[in-house]
Structures are given as structure tokens and as C-alpha cells.
Amino acid sequence: MGKGMKIPLRYQISEYDCGPTALLNGVSYLFPRAEVPPEIIRSVTLYSLDCYGMDGAAGKAGTSRMAMMYLANWLEGFSRAANFPLSCQYISGQAVHVGAHSYVNDAVARGGAAVVRLFYEVEHYALITGASADRIYLFDPYYLAEAEPEFVRAGIEVTCAHPHAYNRIVPFDCFNRETRELYAFGPAETREAVLLFDERTRRTADDTIEYFI
């Protein structure tokens, strides 16, 4: 039944579940389907979507920073206790940027991935899986079949050709802005990311040609 198979990354099924979808996509990106413990799926679903909308409806403001930090710590603790080779690190503030001396760039260069909070009309979560000299490879769980005009203006490519890894190719310049524009990380004090690794395949600095791009 293809137990060693990695599955395509998933899209959110509502306007609100980008957080749990991006986090579970990080796990799917790193691990084959047969290796993923059901407890991870259960707990990510249980502890996300904790924010209430303006009308008082549960989940309608998505997933909070507190919940994402809790889940990163829970995943790290669970993985140690269960001897599962996932490691997680939560970073925030000035530590979240792309480019030189970036924890995010370092993570993907070492074979990991990063769930990041950014802006796409509202605050949003997506998964960074790769980087080149001036582009970030991103899987945005919000489905688009083709680029909208604002993506074209920003130089962002939309692709469905790499379902296991990315569906957007985004210039570095988009991320480090402190504004609420498309894919900006926004003000430094509100930034956050979760770095994820499969410890069996995590590369060292000596193995990584593009270490700290």
C-alpha cells in the first residue's frame, strides 16, 4: 500500500484552518504517511483554532500565537517521549526573517521546513520548504488555481506542479516588510515561526553548501 510514501500537501478546508493545516503539512513534508503517529494529528486538531471571531463564534479568528507555541513545544516533548524523530523549535520577533543569518533559511538548507505567520489579507500560516538565492519556496494552504493580480504585481509565482513541496515562489523582499502587505511577516513583535526537522535526515553545517544564505 505504499507505506513509505509521502503524500501531497493539503489545502485548508475553510477560511480559518490555515494554522493546523500548515503544521500538519510540515509533518507530511518530512515524514512518510505510515510513520506519522495519530496522536500528532489528534493534538494539532485539538489545540488549534482557539480564537473567537467578532461574532463570538469559536475558531473564526483562526489559531493564536499562544496555541502555535504550545503545539511546537508539545510536538517536541511528544517526539522525545515517543522516540519519534521529529524536532521542533519555536522562534519569534526579530529572529523571524529571511536572508542572511536567518533561522528559516538555515532550517530549509538543512532539510527541514518552517511554518510561518504572515499576511494574506489577514494573518495567515504557510509552510516554507526551500530557498534559492533570492526566492522562497512556499506551500500556502489557501488554494489558488492561478495567480491573482496582486500576486503578479508582487512577482509571486503560483504553481500546482509540485504538490509535495511548494505552490508559491516568492521573492525575499515580500517577507521582511513590517507592513500588512501580501506575504509580509509584519511588525517584528508579532512575528513567529515553527522550525521542523526529521532528525534522521537533518543536515549539518558541513553538509550544507548554502548554509546561512
Region spans (language model):
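N-terminal entry module detector
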Residues: M1-G2, G112
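Cysteine-nucleophile protease catalytic domains, especially the papain-like/related folds used
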Residues: G2-G93, I209
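Compositionally biased, intrinsically disordered low-complexity regions
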Residues: G4-K6, D55, A95, S132, ...
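Short, exposed beta-strand "edge-strand" segments with a Pro/Gly-rich flavor and a Y/T-containing core
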Residues: E15, R33-A34, A57-M66, Q94-A95, ...
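Intrinsically disordered, low-complexity boundary segments flanking structured domains
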Residues: L71-G77, A100-V104, R180-L182
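Hydrophobic transmembrane alpha-helix bundles
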Residues: L71-L86, V116-A131, R153-H164
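Active-site-adjacent substructure of cysteine-protease-like catalytic cores
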Residues: Q89-Y143, A147
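Noncatalytic regulatory segments and standalone regulatory/sensor domains
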Residues: V108-A109, A131-I213
